[in-house]
């Protein structure tokens, strides 16, 4: 397992240094982008990728504990003024509101897994158990059409509207 995780490190480093090239600059955009990928991919690597991009957008590194505190809004304004960033090109300033990026990524990486059977491991397991008990379950796309789009997507849109649209 460790070998597989270690292969993502160069990609995470690249994202930190090239985050502005993605065109995702606001917490609301991170919410939808992270969520869209978390619907179909494992949420842990998706979370790490977007977290690295958010840190890189601010010129920070996920590996640095002081940078983590800065993004979580745990540093005083005086400490923020002395914060050393990785690069200076198109860097968004770190503010006491920068934690909204982490919040948007965290929330969407978790909740969007319910959009598909494969978005979260237990979803597929529950489907299989139900089918073994002779409970009729919708197909992959049937689930999305009957439940994800009409029920979950409006809820996620409301979450975005309330918490992330203004940023």
Language-model features, listed with the residues they occupy:
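Transmembrane helix-bundle signature of multi-pass membrane transporters/permeases
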Residues: 32-40, 53, 106-113, 143-149
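Alpha-helical transmembrane segments of multi-pass membrane proteins
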Residues: 25-36, 62-112
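Juxtamembrane and boundary regions of transmembrane helices in multi-pass small-molecule transporters
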Residues: 111-167
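Transmembrane helix-loop boundary segments of multi-pass membrane transporters
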Residues: 15-21, 109, 164-167
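Juxtamembrane/interfacial segments around transmembrane helices
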Residues: 41-46, 51, 79-81, 152-165
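Re-entrant/interfacial helical elements at transmembrane boundaries that shape
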Residues: 13-14, 45-58, 65-70, 120-132
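Transmembrane helical segments that form the transport core of multi-pass membrane transport proteins
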Residues: 1-61
């Amino acid at each position: 397992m460790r070998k597989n995780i270690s292969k993502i490190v160069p990609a995470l480093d690249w994202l930190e240094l090239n985050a502005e090239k993605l065109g995702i600059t606001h917490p609301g955009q991170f919410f939808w982008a992270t969520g869209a990928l978390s619907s179909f991919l494992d949420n842990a690597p998706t979370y790490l990728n977007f977290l690295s991009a958010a840190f890189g957008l601010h010129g920070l590194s996920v590996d640095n504990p002081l940078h983590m505190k800065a993004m979580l809004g745990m540093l005083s304004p005086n400490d923020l003024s002395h914060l050393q960033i990785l690069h200076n090109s198109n860097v968004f300033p770190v503010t006491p509101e920068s934690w909204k990026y982490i919040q948007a990524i965290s929330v969407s990486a978790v909740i969007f897994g319910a959009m598909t059977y494969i978005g979260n491991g237990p979803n597929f397991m529950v489907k299989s158990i139900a089918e073994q008990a002779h409970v009729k379950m919708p197909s992959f796309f049937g689930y999305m059409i009957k439940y994800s789009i009409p029920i979950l997507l409006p809820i996620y849109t409301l979450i975005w509207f309330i918490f992330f649209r203004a940023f």
